[in-house]
């Protein structure tokens, strides 16, 4: 039995087909066979973290708290944990306001913001939420307009969209 058949609608891996294909990458999974000599070279990966120069904000969004820190040239000048309960909140503004609040609180301890890095459980592609347990309470009809680009919206609201920033899975940090 071919992978294409197993990972198709109605196949025994239909859930994976829907999740990995349409939910994460907005298209159906497609499998092709290629001789090894014709395969593409591995892409370069980008390095995460270890950038200590300048005025930076780091944050981590968990299921019970939000953590944020402000750093100037590698020295922590502010660090805070704030309790929150995002899992079953159905209003995406709860998440937006909480994320924004943590970043603002950290930024208030810096003369300027040079870069931002964040993490949370889930799948993030190009700083967009594709799937995340923090957003499980958001109805599907609100997800696309209010959650998928939530980090872009926060950066734009704060005037930081032109700064270097990344949001990644917390296991990647």
Show which residues each predicted segment covers.
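Short, small-residue-rich loop/turn micro-motifs
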Residues: 72, 120-122
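Long, mid-chain structured domain cores
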Residues: 1-83
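Cysteine/selenocysteine-centered motifs that mediate thiol-based redox chemistry or coordinate metal-sulfur cofactors
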Residues: 106-113
